[in-house]
Amino acid sequence: MVQDGKWELQNLKFVGEFMEVNGLSTTMIAEKLGISRQSVYYWLKKDDAMMSNIYAIFETYGLKIRFDLVEEGVQESPMKIPGVGLATKKPRIGFFESYIKRMGIKREQVAEMFGVKKCTVDHWFQFDDCFFSYICKFAQLKGLEVKYTVSRIND
């Protein structure tokens, strides 16, 4: 766990680093997103946010962020398939849905892992959004890492 200002960040460590490197405060991010400072503060305090909010933070600053699930210690994902349809249809959690499908993991099994109902997992994939902590926990349970890359939107 990394101490970042007032927060001990593990899941959202990369968000804290982004803020620190760019001299951003919770107020500055909140103003850019058009939300309350308390919302951003809450995400950092809880070390969790909806995927849509994580993407919004980076997009607001002209950046795109891409996530991938990879085996621990692997630099590039051996499962990475360029141009998979899910990635464009579901830009936020398509990587997660794609992974569980490739591994033959059923949504019922995902729901059981987190102690939620299958309809909750169905909702995530229908609306292409879930809390980032679920993805981190899934990765931990399966011996995976959540990797991310950040680039300019026009790249």
Which residue ranges define each predicted feature?
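The alpha-helix within a helix-turn-helix
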Residues: 19, 30, 58, 100, ...
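DNA major-groove recognition helix of helix-turn-helix
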Residues: 44-45, 61, 125
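A short, Lys/Arg-rich alpha-helix, primarily the initiator
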Residues: 1-22, 75-103
